[in-house]
C-alpha cells in the first residue's frame, strides 16, 4: 500500500494537523494537502468515496457540500471514522458519518444553502485505503437555485481559491469525460493559481458514460490538451448503482474490468483506475511534503522561540508536588525583591526603554522637582521687603533706630526656614507615590496568584506608610534644628559689611555658578505654540538655555540660529492646556510689557508631558527666570510705597535683604543635600531590607499558605494552553527530525504546452472524444492515426517494439509497411503497441489530410483478428 516513505510522511502530517488544529494554529503552518476541485455532478464525491471504500458523503440536488471537508485517510486494521469536533466518539456506521457531516454543516451555515470556509475535520481509519489527506471543496456552480445567495458563484470561487492558492497544496482537478475539457472550471481555477502546472493532477471521470463510439484515449495519454502531471481516468458508480446499494469494492472490481477489456484503454490499464490514482497521489504528496519540510521546520522553530521565554516559568510546574506551593512562594517573594531593587537602584539587565523606572522618577523628584519647589519661595521680592520693613519698625518701636537691628534678620530668617516644611513634606509624598507604584508594577508578576499579590501589596504598602511617618518626623526635625540656631559665622555667609555693598541685581545673579562664563543649563526640543497660521503655525525648534539667554535653532546641530532672547526681565507663567491638544504648555513674557519675539508679547512653549514642563521650569529657575507672582498678593502695594519714602529705612531693608538671601541660600543648600539622604535611609533602604528579610514571615503569618498560593482560573487556563502549545511545537519538531533522509523523491515531469488553458472562454482545438466507426473516411488508410491538430507532442511509447526503429517518411501520415496487403483487418488488436501510430519525425508544419469534421481517424476493432503491428 504505497511506498514506505509515504507511510511515514502522511501520518506525520496527520499528527501535525491534529496537534495544531487543537490549539488553533493549523492555518499558520500551511501543511501539505490535496484539494479536490470539480463542478457539481462531476463525480468528485464518488472519487472520494472510492478512496474510503464506503458511502459517507451527503448527496442530493443542488449544492450539498457547503463547508470544506478535511479528509484524512489512515491505513488501519479496524475500520471507523472520527471527527475533530467530537473526537471521543467513533463512528462505525458510515450512514451516521453522513448525518454528522450534514448536522455539523447546518450548525455553522444554517439550512439556507449558505456556505462557510470553516472546515470539518474527518479521519477515516480503514484497511482499504492508503494514507492520504484531502480537502473536499464545494462544487463549482454558476446559477443560484432556490434559496441560494445571488453571489454563490463568487463565494464558492473565493473559498476554493483560498485553499488551492497555498503553495503547499496539490490540486486534484476532477472533470467528467462527457464534458468539453477546455471548458473545465476545475482546470481553469487550477491554472490561475498554478500556471506552471506543478501542483495540478487531472482526473477524468465518467469514462463509461461517453457517447457510443467515442473514447478519451488522447486525453488520458496527455496528447490532447496536456497537463504537466497528466491525467488519470476513473470509473465511478452510476446513480442507479448507488441507489441499488452496489458495493464500492464491487465497483472497483468493475472499474478494473472496464479498463482491461476496453480496447482504447487496456494498454494503459495499469496506469488507470482508483488504485493507481491513490498511488500516484501518494508519490506526488511524498515529493511535496519533502519540499515543504524545511519551511515547516523553520516556522515551527520561530514559534517555539517566541514561546520559550513565556513558558520558562511553567516548564518545571508539577501540580502533584507537595512542596510546589512552598517553592513557588519562596521563588515569587525572592523575585519580587529582586525586581523591586532593580527598579529602584537601576540595572543594565532588561532595561526599559519605553518609560522611566521608579528609581529614575525618584531621582527627578530629588534633583528637579524639589529644587524647583524651593526656588519658588525666593522670588517673592516685594513681600519679603515689606516683611523686613515691618520687622525693623516693630523692633525700634517708638524709638528712631540708628543701626540696622540683627533681630530683624533672625526673625525673617526663621520665618523663611518654616516655609521649607511644605516643599519638603511634598517631596516625601511624591517619593511615596513612586514607591507604591513601583510595588504594584513588581507584583504584576504575581498575577498568577491573586491572593498572594493582594497580600504582598498590602503588607509592603503598610510598611511604606509606617516609614512615611518616621521620615516626615525626621525632616521636620531637621528644619527645627535649622531654625533653632542662626549661625552667622558660617563660611559662606556674607556678613554685615559685605551685605551693605551688594545690590539686588548682583544678589539675583550670585546663585548662578561661573557667572563670568556662558553656562549651558539645558538643551532640548520645544514647540512654539502661538505662531499664527498665516506665519506657518506651530513649529518645533531646538532650544538652548544658558545663564544669560534662550536661543533656538532649526535642529540639534545648532548651526542655523533662529533667534536669541536675553533673560533680563523675563518671567514664566502657566498656560491652560488646549481642549483638543495633548501638549503641555508654559509661557515666557517680559515684565516691562515689551514684545518677546517679533510681535508676540509672550511665547508659548509646548512639551509632550507635564514632567518635561516641570523640568524646563526648574532649568529656567536656575537661570534666574522666576514664575509670575499672583495678582492677589499685590493688594498692599500702597503700603509698600510708605516705607520707600525713608532713605535710611531703604538702606536697612536692603542690607537685611542681602543677609537673608545669603543665609537662606545656605539653608536651602543644606536641605537639598539632606533630603535625598534622609528619604533614602529612612524609607527606601528600609523598605528594600524589609522586603528581603521580613516580607516572607509577614506573608506566612497573614494567611494560610494554601490560600495564598491558590491559582486564578484564568492563569491556570493560560498556563495549560501555553504548555500544550509549547509541547505540541516540540513534538512536531521531533517528528520532523525523525524523518529518514533515505526517502526518495520522484522527479517532476517536464513542462508541456498548456496554452490551451489561457483562453478561458474558448473551446479545445478538437473535441476530446475520438469516434469509432466501421466506415473509413476517403483519402486515408483506415487504421493509421494522423497527428491531432493540438500541440505537436512526441508520444510516450508503452510497450513499443523495435520494428519501428526506421525513420518515418515525411510525406506519409504513418508507416505503411506494417500492414499486410493494406488489409486493416489482418491483425488482432494488440493495442499496447499502438502509440507508434504517430510518426515522431513529422514536421509540425505538414498539414493533416483528416477531414475537418472528424477529430481523429476512425478505426474498426475486431478482437479475433491478428495483430496490426505484427
UniProtKB/Swiss-Prot annotation:
Residues found modified as Phosphoserine: 764
Region (G3 motif): 136-139
Descriptive protein name: Dynamin-2
Upper lineage: Eukaryota, Metazoa, Chordata, Craniata, Vertebrata
Family: Belongs to the TRAFAC class dynamin-like GTPase superfamily. Dynamin/Fzo/YdjA family.
Signal peptide start-end: none
Region of interest: G5 motif: 235-238
Name of the encoding gene: Dnm2
Binding residue positions for GDP: 41, 43-46, 59-60, 206, 208, 211, 236-237, 239
All copies of domain GED, residue ranges: 653-744
Region G1 motif, annotated ranges: 38-45
Annotated region (G2 motif), positions in chain: 64-66
Phenotype caused by lack of the gene: Exhibits growth and cytokinesis defects.
Documented EC number(s): 3.6.5.5
Pfam families associated with the record: Dynamin_M, Dynamin_N, GED, PH
Residues the record lists as N6-acetyllysine modifications: 299, 598
Amino acid at each position: 500500500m504505497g511506498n514506505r516513505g509515504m507511510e511515514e510522511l502522511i501520518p506525520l502530517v496527520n499528527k501535525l494537523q491534529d496537534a495544531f488544529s487543537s490549539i488553533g494554529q493549523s492555518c499558520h503552518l500551511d501543511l501539505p494537502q490535496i484539494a479536490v476541485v470539480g463542478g457539481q455532478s462531476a463525480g468528485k464525491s464518488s472519487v472520494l468515496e472510492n478512496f474510503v471504500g464506503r458511502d459517507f458523503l451527503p448527496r442530493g440536488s443542488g449544492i450539498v457540500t457547503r463547508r470544506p471537508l478535511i479528509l484524512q485517510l489512515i491505513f488501519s486494521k479496524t475500520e471507523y471514522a472520527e471527527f475533530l469536533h467530537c473526537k471521543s466518539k467513533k463512528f462505525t456506521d458510515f450512514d451516521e458519518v453522513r448525518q454528522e457531516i450534514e448536522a455539523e454543516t447546518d450548525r455553522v451555515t444554517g439550512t439556507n444553502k449558505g456556505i462557510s470556509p470553516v472546515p470539518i475535520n474527518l479521519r477515516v481509519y480503514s484497511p482499504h485505503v492508503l494514507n492520504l489527506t484531502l480537502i473536499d471543496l464545494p462544487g463549482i456552480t454558476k446559477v443560484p437555485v432556490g434559496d441560494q445567495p445571488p453571489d454563490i458563484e463568487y463565494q464558492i470561487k473565493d473559498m476554493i481559491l483560498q485553499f488551492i492558492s497555498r503553495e503547499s497544496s496539490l490540486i486534484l482537478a476532477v472533470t467528467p469525460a462527457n464534458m468539453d475539457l477546455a471548458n473545465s472550471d476545475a482546470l481553469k481555477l487550477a491554472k490561475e493559481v498554478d500556471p506552471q502546472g506543478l501542483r495540478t493532477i487531472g482526473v477524468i471521470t465518467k469514462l463509461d458514460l461517453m457517447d457510443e463510439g467515442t473514447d478519451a484515449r488522447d486525453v488520458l495519454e496527455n496528447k490532447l490538451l496536456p497537463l504537466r502531471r497528466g491525467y488519470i481516468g476513473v470509473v465511478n458508480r452510476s446513480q442507479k448503482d448507488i441507489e441499488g446499494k452496489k458495493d464500492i469494492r464491487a465497483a472497483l472490481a468493475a472499474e478494473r474490468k472496464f479498463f482491461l477489456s476496453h480496447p482504447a484503454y487496456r494498454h494503459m490499464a495499469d496506469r488507470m483506475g482508483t488504485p493507481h490514482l491513490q498511488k500516484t497521489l501518494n508519490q506526488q504528496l511524498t515529493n511535496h511534503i519533502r519540499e515543504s519540510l524545511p519551511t515547516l521546520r523553520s516556522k515551527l522553530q520561530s514559534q517555539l522561540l517566541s514561546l520559550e521565554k513565556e513558558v520558562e516559568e511553567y516548564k518545571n510546574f508539577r501540580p502533584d508536588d507537595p512542596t510546589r506551593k512552598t517553592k513557588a512562594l519562596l521563588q515569587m517573594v525572592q523575585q519580587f525583591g529582586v525586581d523591586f531593587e532593580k527598579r529602584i537602584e537601576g540595572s543594565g539587565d532588561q532595561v526599559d526603554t519605553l518609560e522611566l523606572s521608579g528609581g529614575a522618577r525618584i531621582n527627578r523628584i530629588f534633583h528637579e522637582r524639589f529644587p524647583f519647589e524651593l526656588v519658588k519661595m525666593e522670588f517673592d521680592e516685594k513681600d519679603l521687603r515689606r516683611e523686613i520693613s515691618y520687622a525693623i519698625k516693630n523692633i525700634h518701636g517708638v524709638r528712631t533706630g540708628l543701626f540696622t537691628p540683627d533681630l530683624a534678620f533672625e526673625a525673617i530668617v526663621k520665618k523663611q526656614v518654616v516655609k521649607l516644611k511644605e516643599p519638603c513634606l511634598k517631596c516625601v509624598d511624591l517619593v511615596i507615590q513612586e514607591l507604591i507604584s513601583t510595588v504594584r508594577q513588581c507584583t504584576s508578576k504575581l498575577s498568577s496568584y491573586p491572593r498572594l499579590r493582594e497580600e504582598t501589596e498590602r503588607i509592603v504598602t503598610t510598611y511604606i506608610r509606617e516609614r512615611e511617618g518616621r521620615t516626615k518626623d525626621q525632616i521636620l526635625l531637621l528644619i527645627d534644628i535649622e531654625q533653632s540656631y542662626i549661625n552667622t559665622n558660617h563660611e559662606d555667609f556674607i556678613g554685615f559689611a559685605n551685605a551693605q555693598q551688594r545690590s539686588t541685581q548682583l544678589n539675583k545673579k550670585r546663585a548662578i555658578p561661573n557667572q563670568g562664563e556662558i553656562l549651558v543649563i539645558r538643551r532640548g526640543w520645544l514647540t512654539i505654540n502661538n505662531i499664527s497660521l498665516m506665519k506657518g503655525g506651530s513649529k518645533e525648534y531646538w532650544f538652548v538655555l544658558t545663564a544669560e539667554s534662550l536661543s533656538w535653532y532649526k535642529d540639534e546641530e545648532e548651526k542655523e540660529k533662529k533667534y536669541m532672547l536675553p533673560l533680563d526681565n523675563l518671567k514664566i507663567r502657566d498656560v491652560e492646556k488646549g481642549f483638543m491638544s495633548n501638549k503641555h504648555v508654559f509661557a515666557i513674557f517680559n515684565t516691562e510689557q515689551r514684545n518677546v519675539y517679533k510681535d508676540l508679547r509672550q511665547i508659548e512653549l509646548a512639551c509632550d508631558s507635564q514632567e518635561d514642563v516641570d523640568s524646563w521650569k526648574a532649568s529656567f529657575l536656575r537661570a534666574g527666570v522666576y514664575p509670575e507672582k499672583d495678582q492677589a498678593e499685590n493688594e498692599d502695594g500702597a503700603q509698600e510705597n510708605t516705607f520707600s519714602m525713608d532713605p535710611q529705612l531703604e538702606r536697612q531693608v536692603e542690607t537685611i535683604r542681602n543677609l537673608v538671601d545669603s543665609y537662606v541660600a545656605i539653608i536651602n543648600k543644606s536641605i537639598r543635600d539632606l533630603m535625598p539622604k534622609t528619604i533614602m535611609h529612612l524609607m527606601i533602604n528600609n523598605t528594600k531590607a524589609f522586603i528581603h528579610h521580613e516580607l516572607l514571615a509577614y506573608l506566612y503569618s497573614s494567611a494560610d499558605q494554601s490560600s495564598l498560593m491558590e491559582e486564578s482560573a484564568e492563569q491556570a487556563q493560560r498556563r495549560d494552553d501555553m504548555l500544550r502549545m509549547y509541547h505540541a511545537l516540540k513534538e512536531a519538531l521531533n517528528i520532523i527530525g525523525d524523518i529518514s533522509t533515505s526517502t526518495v523523491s520522484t522527479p517532476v515531469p517536464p513542462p508541456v504546452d498548456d496554452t490551451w488553458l489561457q483562453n478561458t472562454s474558448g473551446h479545445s482545438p478538437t473535441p476530446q472524444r475520438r469516434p469509432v466507426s466501421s466506415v473509413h473516411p476517403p483519402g486515408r488508410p483506415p487504421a493509421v492515426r494522423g497527428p491531432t491538430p493540438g500541440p505537436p507532442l512526441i508520444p510516450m511509447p508503452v510497450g513499443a517494439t523495435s520494428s519501428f526503429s526506421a525513420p518515418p517518411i515525411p510525406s506519409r501520415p504513418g508507416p505503411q509497411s506494417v500492414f499486410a496487403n493494406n488489409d486493416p483487418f489482418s491483425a488482432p488488436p494488440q493495442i499496447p503497441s499502438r502509440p507508434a501510430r504517430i510518426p515522431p519525425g513529422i514536421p509540425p508544419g505538414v498539414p493533416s489530410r483528416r477531414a475537418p469534421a472528424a477529430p481523429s481517424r476512425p478505426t474498426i476493432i475486431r478482437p479475433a483478428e491478428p495483430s496490426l503491428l505484427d
